[in-house]
Amino acid sequence: FTAAATYKMTKQFGFTADFTYNTQRPNMSNFAPAEMPNVDKITIPLGRAGIYFNNDWISLTSLFSYIAKTNNNSTLNLINPNNDKDIKAAALSYDIETIGWTTDAVVKPFKGFDFHFLFTYQSPKYKKYETGVTFSDGTTSGINATGNIVTEIPKVLIELDPSYNITKDLKVWASFRYFSKTYANIKNAYYFNGRWETFGGINWNVNKHLSLSGTVINFLNQTGAKGSISGAELVDKENAAAYNGAWMAGSYIRPFTVEFAAKITF
């Protein structure tokens, strides 16, 4: 279900809103664990409302938004606090929701030059993220991450995308993307500092049959980890310091890379 409305105050300025409501059922991969997943309907409501402004040199929208997703299925391996070799799987079904604010603008101050700007603030949180198990010796173990920030999702996103058409067939461009602090595990005990990811390049349409391009990835040569830390999902803040200096597996920022490409059209 989708609905949208726009109200024009003037030829250039107005208000806009839209709402989308999607539903689905769990997919086949949710049945892979031994535990039966929650087969309740998954709902994804998305609502946005804000303003827009357009003229010859700028196109701008600024929107407040709300989005949620219910009945996400997951399985956690909980460890017996009295025996770290005693591990039991626990199924859970949880929700995610966030409110946010996004401003998107395309500026064309002079012929051939475009500048795209995007700013997003969001605060995605877990809801009903609770589960637990009882081990054979009677010991219980559980997790409650309700209210925690969703892993790997930054609160602040910024995109800066300038481009310039030297001729109608030759274009240079760059892209700067900022991701604020992201949490690396469910209990928000570990986090990665904010980072920039940078790209740049040149595109040349030689003729109707041949296009050439060159791209530089991470031209500021940023380094570091990102994403999540495998095996650290259930470490809490009180015990996080115990892992200082320990080797952990995760993912990393893509290193400095230069790429060339050619496209031939017959």
Model regions: which residues?
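Residues that define the transmembrane beta-barrel architecture of outer-membrane proteins
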Residues: 1, 43-47, 52-56, 66, ...
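Flexible loop and strand-edge segments within Gram-negative outer membrane beta-barrel domains
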Residues: 24-29, 33-37
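A surface-exposed, glycine/aromatic-enriched loop/edge motif typical of exported proteins
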Residues: 30, 39, 75, 225-231
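Short glycine/proline- and charge-enriched loop/turn segments
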Residues: 31-34, 82-84, 234-242
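Outer-membrane beta-barrel domain signature
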Residues: 35-40, 90-93, 145-150, 187-191, ...
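C-terminal beta-signal and adjacent terminal beta-strands/loops
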Residues: 181-182, 204-266
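Short, basic/aromatic-rich helical patch in the C-terminal catalytic core of site-specific tyrosine
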Residues: 200-202
